[in-house]
Swiss-Prot record:
Protein name: Prephenate dehydratase
Keyword match Cell inner membrane: no
GO molecular function: prephenate dehydratase activity; protein homodimerization activity
Gene (UniProt): pheA
Enzyme class (EC, first level): lyase
A single GO BP: L-phenylalanine biosynthetic process
Pathway: Amino-acid biosynthesis; L-phenylalanine biosynthesis; phenylpyruvate from prephenate: step 1/1
Length: 315
């Protein structure tokens, strides 16, 4: 029975994403029955990843990117250091919030409990409807609901699920500044063989480059000359020395795609360190797939065997 850490307490978007991963049979070693999985709530995303490293959990469901604020930096920073971890699945969740109050609340809202990531996604709504309210930081969206239930805030930015579990009333539902807000969650575990190639896959690595002119361009060239579609590049400080960075790269394709495998080998030769973060299915194609090397392989095989090769136009 897999143990899966997630940002708790119950009622967070992360829990909702985890439940959908379970029902979609996306958990290695699990099935679509949520009773076959043991949820392990944690106080933060880094704590969930550390639970996997320590063996207290088999996997962690964590947010990695949202369409409003971009990458979830605590997740990236935690993946870049410590014992290596690997991504096995992803799920994108539509996000909107509920402004929750206690059932007996009838008055002004002076304080609003909010997870900082959530507050950033409803900034305009708050400025319009609760301009005088003071934000009170919470550890998660569900923790914001708990703060309201405990009387530590007049209202909270939370989820409908958390409101139901804490017996709160919704002052406003479906609140979000951008109607197409989405958050991408990933399932992270200790290193293991990746899920099978599906043809709609994503591969992610974190690179440490030598401090030499053109090092980043040289690394990117290894992808471009193989026609690999790079979908994300982002840098984060190493926190060890000023001016040194870790570069996170996402590309379309799987470790079992020849072009991706060759690019990773080339990066391994060029970079000070290549941390493989996984190859996993995305469900839908998110860019141009890497080119097949079948024809080139057949051509090379004929050369090695001393057989005639057709002219370029006769393939």
């Amino acid at each position: 029975m897999p143990r899966i850490a997630y940002l708790g307490p119950q009622g967070t978007f992360t829990e909702s994403a985890l439940l959908q991963m379970i029902s979609g049979a996306m958990v290695p070693g699990g099935d679509a029955d949520d009773t076959a999985v043991t949820p392990v709530p944690t106080d933060s995303t880094p704590a969930g990843l550390e639970a996997v490293r320590s063996g207290a959990a088999d996997y962690a469901c964590v947010p990695i990117e949202n369409s409003i604020e971009g990458s979830v930096l605590p997740t990236l920073d935690s993946l870049a250091v410590g014992a290596p971890l690997q991504i096995f699945a992803e799920l994108t969740l539509a996000v909107s919030f509920s402004i929750v109050v206690r059932p007996d609340h009838d008055g002004d809202v002076g304080t609003v409990a909010a997870f900082p990531v959530a507050a950033a996604q409803v900034r305009r709504w708050l400025a319009e409807h609760l301009p005088a309210a003071q934000l009170v930081p919470a550890h998660s969206n569900a923790a914001a609901a708990a703060d309201v239930a405990g009387g530590r805030a007049d209202a909270g930015i939370s989820t409908a699920l958390a409101a139901e579990r804490y017996g709160l009333r919704s002052l406003a539902a479906g609140v979000v500044d951008e109607p197409n807000a989405r958050t991408r969650f990933v399932l992270v575990g200790r290193p293991a063989p990746p899920p099978a190639r599906t043809g709609a896959d994503r591969t992610s690595v974190a690179l440490r480059l030598p401090n030499t002119p053109g090092a980043l361009v040289a690394a990117m060239t290894e992808l471009s000359i193989r026609d690999i579609d790079l979908t994300r590049i982002e840098s984060r400080p190493t926190r060890t020395e000023l001016g040194t960075y870790v570069f996170f790269l996402d590309c379309v394709g799987h470790l079992e795609d020849d072009a991706v495998a060759e690019a990773l080998k080339a990066l391994h030769r060029r970079c000070e360190d290549v941390r493989y973060l996984g190859s996993w299915p995305t469900g839908t194609a998110a860019g141009a797939p890497p080119p097949s090397s079948d024809e080139a392989t057949r051509w090379l095989t004929r050369l090695r065997e001393g057989l005639p090769t057709p002219p370029e136009g006769g393939r």
